[in-house]
C-alpha cells in the first residue's frame, strides 16, 4: 500500500496543497512543522546513528502546518482562480455533459468553451463546461444561442478547499473532514461526499 499524500497548510490553517510523505519528513527534519492535525499517523525509519546505534524515526500526521508557507497575498492570488485542466474540470462537473445530461468516462468527454475562444472567450473555469464529444461537435464554434443549446448546470470557480478535493482521489477521512469544512453549502462536491 502506498502512503497517501499529506495535506499541507500554512500556520494559519489555510490549505496550501498536497505534498509527498518525503516532503513531510523533510519539513519535520528541518524543524519547519508548526503543528499537526488529523487522526492518521505515519512513521518513517531512517538510518542508524553511529554514536548511539539507534535508528532514526520521524512520525508525521496526515495534516501538517508548515512554517514559512504562509499564504498571504501570494496565496490569495494563487487560489483566486486555480489552473484548469480537463481532469479537474470533469471532476468538478461530475463527469456530466452540460448539454445532454449523460455521464461519461474521461475518454468520451471534452472541454467546451461556453463563449467560443474564436469570439474572445477565455479558457477560464466560468467559461468552461464538460461536454460529451457529440454535444461539443453539435455546438461547434458557436454561442449557446446560435447553436440553440442550453446549459443544464452553471459553471463555477472552485475555492481552494474544493480544488484540493478535486486534485486528489485518495483523500483520508480526516483530511476530507478538514477540507469539507471550507466547501460552500451549495457546492456540487457536497452532494458527492
Residue spans for each PLM region:
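Short helix-coil boundary/hinge micro-motifs
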Residues: 1-81, 86, 157-193
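A generic structural motif
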Residues: 12, 122, 135-136
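A residue-level signal for conserved active-site and pocket-lining positions in enzyme catalytic cores
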Residues: 13, 89, 147
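Histidine-centered nuclease catalytic patch
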Residues: 82, 102-130, 139-155
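Short helix-to-loop capping/linker segments positioned immediately adjacent to catalytic or ligand/cofactor-binding
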Residues: 86-88, 99-101
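Short metal-coordination and nucleic-acid-contact micro-motifs, chiefly zinc-binding Cys/His arrays
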Residues: 90-95, 124-128
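Short cysteine-rich clusters marking metal-coordination/redox-active sites
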Residues: 97-100, 132-135
Amino acid at each position: 500500500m502506498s502512503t497517501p499524500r499529506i495535506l499541507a497548510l500554512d500556520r494559519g490553517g489555510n490549505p496550501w496543497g498536497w505534498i509527498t510523505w518525503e516532503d513531510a519528513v523533510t519539513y519535520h527534519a528541518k524543524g519547519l512543522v508548526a503543528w499537526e492535525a488529523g487522526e492518521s499517523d505515519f512513521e518513517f525509519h531512517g538510518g542508524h546513528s553511529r554514536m548511539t546505534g539507534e535508528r532514526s524515526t520521524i512520525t508525521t500526521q496526515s495534516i501538517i502546518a508548515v512554517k514559512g508557507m504562509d499564504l498571504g497575498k501570494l496565496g490569495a492570488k494563487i487560489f483566486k482562480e486555480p489552473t484548469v485542466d480537463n481532469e479537474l474540470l470533469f471532476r468538478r462537473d461530475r463527469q456530466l455533459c452540460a448539454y445532454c445530461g449523460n455521464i461519461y468516462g474521461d475518454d468520451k468527454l471534452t472541454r467546451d468553451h461556453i463563449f467560443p475562444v474564436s469570439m474572445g472567450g477565455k479558457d477560464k473555469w466560468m467559461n468552461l463546461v464538460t461536454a460529451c464529444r457529440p454535444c461539443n461537435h453539435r455546438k461547434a464554434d458557436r454561442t449557446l444561442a446560435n447553436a440553440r443549446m442550453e446549459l443544464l448546470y452553471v459553471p463555477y470557480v472552485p475555492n481552494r478547499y474544493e480544488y484540493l478535493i478535486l486534485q486528489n482521489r485518495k483523500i483520508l477521512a480526516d483530511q476530507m473532514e478538514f477540507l469539507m469544512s471550507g466547501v460552500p453549502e451549495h457546492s456540487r462536491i457536497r452532494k458527492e461526499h
